[in-house]
Amino acid sequence: MTELARHESGFLLRTEEGELRSRSVLLATGVHNRRPNMSEAMHDDALSRGLLRYCPICDGYEVTDTNVAVIGSGNHGLQEALFLRGFTERVTLVAPDGVHALSEEDFSLAEDAAISLIDGPIAAITIEGDQLCLATPSGRLAFTSVYPALGSVIRSELGRSVGADLSDKGCILVDAHQRTSYQGLYAAGDVVIGLDQISHAMGEGGVAATTIRNDLANIKPLYRGRP
């Protein structure tokens, strides 16, 4: 879908194949993780081999007692490194572009957790054997797995285009039944505020589907065999 617009009976959806009309729309457009500077082919290879990972909540246990790096800085990057510290003693936080942007409190937290801090910029990322290597001003560093903590782009443009309320970070705001602020529009998954996990998104999708069915039935009874 390339465009979502309001219509007198609901919504007008434009796609590459043409236009559709719908009384209700469920947006499950998710987010796009910001990637480290590496070719798509290398990125996909590293991802398939577990050298590059994006969700420590999902698979942090798989890097137990290995040598792990987090690419990121600021409190966001540090929090991911601290989370991974629960799985392994060897965690390094590498700033992608320059010196670390950490507060005194952040530096203290990193020191207390024995997290190594490496300033960037990262000049190159390569795969060498079963390790992902980062070229930094401190030298070439090799890791069993690397987690980018570079943030994400929330794909909420379609919701914004019809006037749905968004959070300060751009997530679509919904009620307990996945309704947005615009009647007939629903949202589920990573595009709304919550835990970015498949199982959580599936649950929200189930809630949204039930809500949509019931809301449509309140407009007009849904009886089989009747137009």
Describe the predicted segments one by one.
Residues 1-8, 12-14, 19-22, 86-171, ...:
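A Rossmann-like FAD-binding core segment of flavoenzymes
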Residues 1-66, 136, 145, 172-176, ...:
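FAD-binding core/adjacent interface of flavoenzyme oxidoreductases
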Residues 36-38, 64, 79-81, 103, ...:
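Short glycine-/acidic-enriched loop or helix-start segments at secondary-structure transitions
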Residues 66-67, 90:
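Residues that mark the start of a beta-strand
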Residues 72-74:
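Glycine-rich Rossmann-fold phosphate-binding loop(s) that bind the pyrophosphate
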Residues 78-80, 188-227:
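A conserved FAD-binding loop/helix module that cradles the flavin
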